[in-house]
């Protein structure tokens, strides 16, 4: 049977349309527009692209995006002071600090400074802890988006063996918690894992997030598996490639996400969902 490509582009479009509809409904009831503060420190080209995409989505669906483009020389104290002001601002529902930050700024301290109820990236220890305790509120956007992509396959995830390649705080670790919550048996692999191939070959669901082009050999994919490729790497030829050898993997998988057009659009869409959630909780507090 031919592989089914899971389109993140289509699902993201649908998701953002639903969020926009909810926002219009709230505004018709006399509520203010949701507010999202987006902070960018420095001029990293990739970060500028990501931030631009997030701001564009806000404009499309009716979220007031407040931009804070700060110079590379911004001190940690200055950034924390801005976050404190935004935490107190009743018109700001979400605060997003684009990572990575310059080396002289402690990203952990910055993430922890954001009020948990405004942490729309889902990185604050409080929100990660709630996910671990099976009571999630604001969830890390990429894993959250991946779970929505998995829903479109129609599979019952209970009891499936999910293997995650990469154990980052942004994707791998919260992804493990999401899949546990969905009833999967979860294996997390990382740079110290021995015999990675053996683990990958057993995966009913494979999530790869290492940032290395075509790191996973397509021949390793278990027949009928679902492959979620989080990586997005630009080669010397200018083409974008994922962390998995797509063509070979597609010969064996039942479902696979493309690069681009797979996980990436859903990450931004779930940021919009989280901002709406924070906005709703603000009024229901």
Curated annotation (Swiss-Prot):
Gene3D superfamilies: Leucine Dehydrogenase, chain A, domain 1 (3.40.50.10860), NAD(P)-binding Rossmann-like Domain (3.40.50.720). One of its GO terms (cellular component) is cytosol. Signal peptide: none annotated. Its EC number is 1.5.1.5, 3.5.4.9. It catalyses: (6R)-5,10-methylene-5,6,7,8-tetrahydrofolate + NADP(+) = (6R)-5,10-methenyltetrahydrofolate + NADPH; (6R)-5,10-methenyltetrahydrofolate + H2O = (6R)-10-formyltetrahydrofolate + H(+). Coiled coil: none annotated. One of its GO terms (biological process) is methionine biosynthetic process. It comes from the Bacteria. One of its GO terms (molecular function) is methylenetetrahydrofolate dehydrogenase (NADP+) activity. Pathway: One-carbon metabolism; tetrahydrofolate interconversion. PROSITE patterns: THF_DHG_CYH_1, THF_DHG_CYH_2. Keywords: Amino-acid biosynthesis, Histidine biosynthesis, Hydrolase, Methionine biosynthesis, Multifunctional enzyme, NADP, One-carbon metabolism, Oxidoreductase, Purine biosynthesis. Pfam families: THF_DHG_CYH, THF_DHG_CYH_C. NADP(+) binds at residues 166-168, 232. Homodimer. Catalyzes the oxidation of 5,10-methylenetetrahydrofolate to 5,10-methenyltetrahydrofolate and then the hydrolysis of 5,10-methenyltetrahydrofolate to 10-formyltetrahydrofolate. Belongs to the tetrahydrofolate dehydrogenase/cyclohydrolase family. PANTHER family: C-1-TETRAHYDROFOLATE SYNTHASE, CYTOPLASMIC (PTHR48099:SF5), C-1-TETRAHYDROFOLATE SYNTHASE, CYTOPLASMIC-RELATED (PTHR48099). This is Bifunctional protein FolD. It comes from Actinobacillus succinogenes (strain ATCC 55618 / DSM 22257 / CCUG 43843 / 130Z). The lineage of its organism: Bacteria, Pseudomonadati, Pseudomonadota, Gammaproteobacteria, Pasteurellales.
């Amino acid at each position: 049977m031919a592989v089914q490509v899971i389109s993140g582009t289509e699902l993201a479009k649908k998701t953002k349309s639903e969020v926009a509809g909810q926002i219009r409904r709230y505004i018709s009831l006399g509520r203010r527009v949701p507010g999202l503060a987006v902070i960018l420190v420095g001029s990293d080209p990739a970060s500028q692209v990501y931030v631009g995409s997030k701001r564009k989505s806000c404009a499309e669906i009716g979220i007031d995006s407040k931009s804070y483009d700060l110079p590379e020389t911004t001190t940690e104290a200055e950034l924390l002071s801005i976050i404190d002001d935004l935490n107190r601002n009743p018109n700001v529902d979400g605060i997003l600090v684009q990572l990575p930050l310059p080396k002289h700024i402690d990203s952990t301290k910055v993430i922890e400074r954001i009020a948990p109820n405004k942490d729309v990236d889902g990185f604050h220890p409080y929100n990660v802890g709630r996910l671990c305790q099976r009571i999630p509120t604001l969830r890390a956007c990429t894993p959250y988006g991946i779970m929505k992509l998995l829903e479109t396959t129609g599979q019952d995830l209970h009891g499936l063996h999910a293997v995650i390649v990469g154990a980052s705080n942004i994707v791998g670790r919260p992804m493990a918690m999401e899949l546990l919550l969905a009833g999967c048996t979860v294996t997390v692999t990382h740079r110290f894992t021995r015999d990675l191939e053996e683990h990958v070959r057993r995966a009913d669901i494979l999530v790869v997030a290492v940032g290395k082009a075509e790191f996973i050999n397509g021949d390793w994919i278990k027949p009928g598996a679902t492959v979620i490729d989080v990586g997005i790497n630009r080669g010397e030829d200018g083409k974008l490639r994922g962390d998995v050898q797509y063509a070979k993997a597609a010969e064996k998988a039942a479902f696979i996400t493309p690069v681009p057009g797979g996980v990436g659009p859903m990450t931004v869409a779930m940021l919009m969902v989280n901002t709406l959630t924070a906005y709703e909780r603000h009024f229901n507090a």
